C-alpha cells in the first residue's frame, strides 16, 4: 500500500512484534518489500519483551521484532518506549538507553558494531525518522544534545550513565554532578570507576 500510494519513506511501523512469530519464508518476502517501500521501524524492546508471550507456556516468544535482520537490510530502525509507569509496563522509565540495553540482550546484538547500531537507534535514527533538521554535531547544527558520563556509545548502553548536561540550542538547561563510587574497607580506602577511560 505504501508504494501504491506513493508514500515511500513516509511510513513507520511501530513495534512490528508480529514479525517475531512469522515464519522465515514469509519474512524473507516481507523485508524486501519493506526496503522497496522505505519503511522505517520503531521497536519497543522493553514493552514487547514484557507483554509478548506473556500467556505462552514454554517456549515463550520474546516479542521484539527482528531488529538484526531489519538493520542488515538497511532499514532505519529506532528504539522507543511507549508505556511508562502505566498498567502495561510499570517499570519503564522513558529512558531510551534502557530500550537500547534491552535490545542488545533480547536481540543478541552483542557485537561491537551491533551495539553501536543500537546506540544510533536511540540517537541518529529517530532524528532521521522524524525528519529533524539541524540534528547532529556538525557546525551549524542546532546544538541540541545530552552529555553522558560514558567514554563511548557501548559504555553508554552498558551503564545507562549520569546525564551530565542537557543542552538545547547551545544552552545548558539541566545538569547533574558526575557519579562517583567510593569503597571503604578497613585499611583499604579506595574509589572505583565503572567507566572505562
Residue ranges and their predicted role:
Residues 18-19, 46-49, 84-85, 152-153, ...:
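Short, glycine-/Ser/Thr-/acidic-enriched flexible segments
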Residues 21-22, 50-51, 113, 156, ...:
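Glycine/Thr-rich phosphate-binding loops of Rossmann-like dinucleotide-binding domains
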Residues 1-65:
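Active-site core of metal-dependent hydrolases
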Residues 116-197:
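Active-site microenvironment of metallo-dependent hydrolases
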Residues 2-10, 47-51, 61-148:
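His/Asp/Glu-enriched, well-ordered alpha-helical/loop segment
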Residues 26-27, 92, 159:
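Residues at alpha-helix caps and immediate loop-helix transition turns in enzyme cores, especially N-
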Amino acid at each position: 500500500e505504501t508504494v501504491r500510494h506513493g508514500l515511500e519513506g513516509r511510513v513507520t511501523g511501530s513495534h512490528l512484534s508480529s514479525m517475531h512469530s512469522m515464519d522465515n519464508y514469509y519474512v524473507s518476502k516481507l523485508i524486501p518489500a519493506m526496503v522497496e517501500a522505505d519503511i522505517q521501524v520503531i521497536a519497543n524492546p522493553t514493552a514487547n519483551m514484557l507483554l509478548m508471550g506473556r500467556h505462552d507456556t514454554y517456549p515463550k516468544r520474546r516479542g521484539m521484532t527482528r531488529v538484526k535482520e531489519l538493520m542488515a537490510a538497511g532499514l532505519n530502525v529506532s528504539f522507543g518506549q511507549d508505556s511508562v509507569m502505566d498498567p502495561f509496563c510499570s517499570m519503564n522509565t522513558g529512558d531510551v538507553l534502557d530500550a537500547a540495553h534491552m535490545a542488545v540482550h533480547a536481540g543478541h546484538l552483542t557485537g561491537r558494531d551491533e551495539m553501536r547500531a543500537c546506540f544510533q537507534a536511540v540517537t541518529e535514527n529517530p532524528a532521521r525518522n522524524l525528519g529533524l533538521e539541524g540534528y547532529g554535531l556538525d557546525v551549524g547544527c542546532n546544538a541540541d544534545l545530552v552529555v553522558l558520563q560514558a567514554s563511548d556509545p557501548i559504555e553508554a548502553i552498558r551503564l545507562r550513565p549520569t546525564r551530565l548536561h542537557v543542552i538545547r540550542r547551545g544552552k545548558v538547561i539541566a545538569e547533574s554532578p558526575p557519579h562517583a563510587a567510593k569503597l571503604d574497607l578497613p585499611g583499604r580506602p579506595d574509589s572505583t570507576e565503572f567507566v572505562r577511560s
